[in-house]
A protein has these predicted regions:
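Bacterial N-terminal signal peptides that target proteins for export
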Residues: 1-12
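Extracellular glycan-interacting surfaces
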Residues: 12, 22-692
C-alpha cells in the first residue's frame, strides 16, 4: 500500500475513530509472459539457481534452472532503476551484487543483497550511473565498478569504495564494461564509450589498448579466457575483436553482419574454448572455430540483453531478451523454448476483457514490435494481434459485444475483423444540406379583373445528403448498449447503430443556428456510459456532464463540482445515482447530476473505475484499490495484486463476477469477486459536504 493511501486512511481513522479491516482476496496473475531481462546471473558452478534483473528495478529468482520464476525484491524506490549487471558471490549463493542507473530520479549505484535477492542495500556510488561490476576471481573481496565518471574499487566486499581512475580524465569516463584477470586482481580491463583501457597496477596507471580497433568504438563487453588470461575478447559498435596478447593488438572477427554489430555480451564456452557466443541486439551468433566462422542461431528479431551458459552442460544456454523474457536451449542453440512461468513483466498500456467470456482478454503493450496480445484461454497462451495497425500501439482498447475496438494514437477507430484476422478502419458519416432545383408550387391560374396572368411561385427545397469518410477523431472512451454504441472523442460524442461500422456525431445542443451550438457538439468528451435499458446516456466533458433520458434524442447539461485536470471515470449505479471518479477523488450524485456529494476518497487521485456485482471498485494513482457496495456512499480498502506502482487499467466481467487489473509492469491479474464482494469490512463514510 502506497504512502498516499496510508496517509489518507490514517486521516480517516483519526477522524472517525474506526479501524479498517481488509478482506483477504486472492489475485491470480495470468500473463502475458515474458518481458525485458536486462541482466542475468547464476550461482557459480550451479545454474539451477538463477537471478534476473529488469529495467525498472525488479529482481526475480529461479531455483529449478529457470523453469519457474518468482519475484524476490526490488532495487530503488521509484521503479526506474535499470539493473545493468548482477553477480553472485562464489563464496555465498545468498550474496548478490547489482549495479543500476535511473531514468529520472537521480538514483543509481552499487547494491548488495545478503538474502538471495529479497532485500537490497545501497552500498556505494550513490547517484551515479553504474553500468558494470566485476568480482576478482583470485580475491572475491575485491570488486571493481565502472561508472560514468570513472572506475571504483572496493577491497572489503563493497563496504568502502575509492576511485582508481584519474578524476575528470577526458577519456577515462562513461564505462560500459569491466573485466578482471582471473589470476591477478590488479590487472583490469575497462571499456568506455571511446575504446578500451587497461591497468596492471590496480589503477595507478592506465593505458589505452586499442591497436587494431576502429577508433571511437564504444566497448560494451570484455571477456577474458579463464584458461589463458592473455586471450581477450571485446565487443564494440564497430564489431567483435580478439586479442591474443592481453589487449596489445586486436583483430576484428569477420562473419557477423554490420546490422548485428551491437554486441552486448561475449561468452566463451567453459568446456570448449574455441566456441564463443556473441549476444547482439539482432540475435545470438555462434562460432565453433575460434571466430573463423559465425552463424546466427536465433531469429534475427531477438534482442539478447544477457546470457548464462551452464558450466556443467555447456549446450544449455539461458538467454535474457528484450520483450520475450527467458529463452532456453538444451542443444547449443539449435532449438529454443520460452521459460517464463512466473515471470510476467510486460509494460501494459491498456487492457480489455470480454464481458461474457472469462477466458478472453487483450492487452496493449508499449512495444512497436508486438503492440497487442490476445488470450482466448485465460492466459495460458497469448497471440499477437498486430495486422492492420499502422501507427504503433493504440491509445486505448475496448471490448464490445461483437469484439475488440482499438483507438490509435494519432486518431481514428479500428475494429478487429476476426474473419480477416486484421484491424479494419470504421467510417464517420456526416450529413450536409444541398439545395435541389427550383420547382413550381402553383400550377392553377386565377383570373381577376386586376390581373390576367398570375405567375407561378417558386420555392427551393433542401435535401440532406450523407458523406462517408474514415473516422479520424481521437477516441477517449466507448460504451455499448443494446441498440446504440457511443464513442467519446476529442471532437465530440459519436453514435453507431450498426455495430460500430459507421458513426455519426451526436447533437448535444438543440438544432438551432449559432456558433455556441457547434462548440457544444464538438467539445472534447472524456467518458461515456449507457444504462442497462439504453434509455439513459451520460457523457462527460472537462466542464460538464451531458445526460439523456430518452436514448440520446434530447440532452440536459449538468455542471461538474470541480474542474478536472486528469482522467475522468463514470459509473451509473441506476438512472438517478452516478459515481464520478477523478483526480479530485470520488463524487456521487443521486439526482442525475443536479447536485453532488464528495465521497470519503477526496484526498486520493483516482486512476480508474470498474463496476462489479453489487458494487464499484476504484484504483488510485499509487495502485491501491477501494470498494463501495452502496453506490459510493461508503468505501473500504481492498487488497490489490502483488504489484508495485500504478494499475494501467481496471476492468470487470459480469460473467463470473471477476475484477481484472493490469499492472503497468507486472502483467494482468484476475480476482474472483464472489467472496470479496459480499464480505463485510469496515468502511469509510462519505463526506457530508455537498457541492452544487
Amino acid at each position: 500500500m502506497g504512502v498516499e493511501t496510508r496517509r489518507a486512511i490514517h486521516a480517516f481513522v483519526l477522524l472517525l475513530g474506526c479501524s479498517l479491516s481488509v478482506s483477504a482476496q486472492n489475485w491470480k496473475q495470468v500473463g502475458p509472459p515474458g518481458g525485458d531481462v536486462q541482466s542475468l546471473a547464476a550461482v557459480p558452478g550451479n545454474t539451477r539457481t538463477l537471478f534476473l534483473g529488469t529495467s525498472d528495478g525488479h529482481v526475480f529468482g529461479s531455483r529449478d534452472g529457470g523453469d519457474h520464476w518468482a519475484l524476490l525484491g526490488r532495487i530503488g524506490e521509484h521503479h526506474d532503476d535499470v539493473i545493468m549487471s548482477m553477480i553472485v558471490d562464489p563464496r555465498s549463493p545468498n550474496t548478490l551484487y547489482a549495479t543500476s542507473w535511473t531514468l529520472s530520479s537521480h538514483g543509481g549505484g552499487v547494491y548488495r543483497s545478503a538474502d538471495a535477492g529479497h532485500t537490497w542495500q545501497l552500498i556505494g556510488l550513490e547517484g551515479l550511473v553504474v553500468r558494470a561490476i566485476a568480482q576478482a576471481p583470485s580475491n572475491p573481496d575485491i570488486l571493481i565498478a565502472g561508472a560514468t565518471d570513472g572506475v571504483y574499487r572496493s577491497e572489503d566486499s563493497g563496504k568502502r569504495w575509492f576511485r582508481i581512475s584519474p578524476e575528470k580524465h577526458e577519456d577515462l569516463r562513461n564505462f560500459d564494461s569491466i573485466a578482471i584477470d582471473p589470476h591477478d586482481p590488479n590487472t583490469i580491463y575497462a571499456g568506455t564509450y571511446h575504446l578500451p583501457w587497461k591497468t596492471v597496477d590496480g589503477g595507478k596507471n592506465w593505458a589505452s589498448v586499442h591497436q587494431g580497433m576502429v577508433d571511437d568504438s564504444d566497448v560494451m563487453s570484455i571477456t577474458i579466457d579463464q584458461n589463458n588470461a592473455s586471450h581477450v575478447f571485446a565487443s564494440a559498435c564497430s564489431g567483435i575483436y580478439h586479442s591474443p596478447d592481453g589487449g596489445a593488438n586486436w583483430t576484428k572477427f569477420k562473419g557477423i553482419p554490420k546490422d548485428s554489430r551491437r554486441t552486448v555480451h561475449i561468452l566463451q564456452d567453459p568446456k570448449r574454448p574455441a566456441t564463443v557466443y556473441a549476444a547482439t541486439t539482432e540475435g545470438l551468433w555462434k562460432t565453433s572455430d575460434d571466430g573463423a566462422n559465425w552463424r546466427l542461431i536465433t531469429p534475427v528479431s531477438w534482442s539478447i540483453l544477457s546470457m548464462v551458459i551452464d558450466p556443467e552442460n555447456s549446450d544449455r544456454l539461458i538467454l535474457g531478451t528484450e520483450r520475450l523474457g527467458i529463452q532456453m536451449s538444451d542443444n547449443g542453440g539449435e532449438t529454443y523454448r520460452a521459460s517464463n512461468q512466473g515471470f510476467s513483466h510486460r509494460r501494459i498500456v491498456d487492457a480489455a476483457v470480454d464481458p461474457q467470456h472469462p477466458e478472453r482478454a487483450i492487452v496493449v503493450l508499449t512495444s512497436n514490435f508486438e503492440p497487442m496480445l490476445e488470450t482466448k484461454d485465460a492466459g495460458r497462451t497469448w497471440t499477437p494481434l498486430a495486422t492492420g495497425l499502422t501507427s504503433g500501439p493504440p491509445r486505448h482498447i475496448f471490448a464490445s459485444p461483437d469484439g475488440w475496438f482499438a483507438a490509435p494514437g494519432p486518431g481514428g477507430l479500428l475494429r478487429y475483423d476476426s474473419a480477416k484476422s486484421s484491424w479494419m478502419p470504421v467510417n464517420q458519416v456526416t450529413e450536409k444540406s444541398a439545395p435541389t432545383q427550383s420547382r413550381n408550387t402553383a400550377s392553377v391560374k386565377k383570373v381577376s379583373t386586376q390581373s390576367t396572368n398570375a405567375p407561378a411561385s417558386k420555392a427551393t427545397a433542401t435535401a440532406m445528403t450523407k458523406a462517408t469518410a474514415p473516422f479520424h477523431a481521437k477516441v477517449n472512451d466507448m460504451a455499448f448498449g443494446q441498440n446504440a454504441w457511443y464513442a467519446a472523442t476529442e471532437e465530440g460524442l459519436f453514435a453507431s447503430r450498426d455495430h460500430g461500422l459507421n458513426w455519426t456525431r451526436v447533437a448535444l445542443a438543440p438544432a438551432q443556428q449559432g456558433a455556441a451550438v457547434s462548440a457544444v457538439n464538438s467539445a472534447a468528451m472524456r467518458a461515456v456510459r449507457i444504462s442497462n435499458g439504453d434509455s439513459y446516456v451520460w457523457a462527460l466533458s472537462s466542464k460538464q456532464m451531458e445526460v439523456s433520458g430518452d436514448g440520446g434524442r434530447t440532452w440536459m447539461s449538468r455542471t461538474l463540482p470541480f474542474e478536472p485536470r486528469g482522467q475522468l471515470h463514470l459509473h451509473p449505479q441506476d438512472e438517478k445515482t452516478v459515481v464520478l471518479a477523478s483526480d479530485h477523488g470520488v463524487f456521487v450524485s443521486r439526482d442525475t447530476g443536479e447536485s453532488w456529494h464528495q465521497a470519503s476518497l477526496s484526498e486520493l487521485s483516482i486512476d480508474d473505475l470498474a463496476p462489479v456485482r453489487n458494487g464499484v471498485v476504484v484504483s488510485t494513482a499509487k495502485g491501491s484499490l477501494f470498494l463501495s457496495r452502496d453506490g459510493g456512499k461508503t468505501w473500504g480498502p481492498m487488497n490489490g495484486p502483488d504489484a508495485e506502482g500504478s494499475l494501467s487499467a481496471l476492468r470487470s466481467r459480469e460473467v463470473g463476477n471477476q475484477l481484472v487489473a493490469a499492472s503497468a509492469t507486472e502483467g494482468l491479474f484476475v480476482l474472483e469477486m464472489g467472496a470479496a464482494s459480499s464480505a463485510s469490512a469496515d468502511s469509510i463514510p462519505a463526506s457530508p459536504t455537498a457541492q452544487q
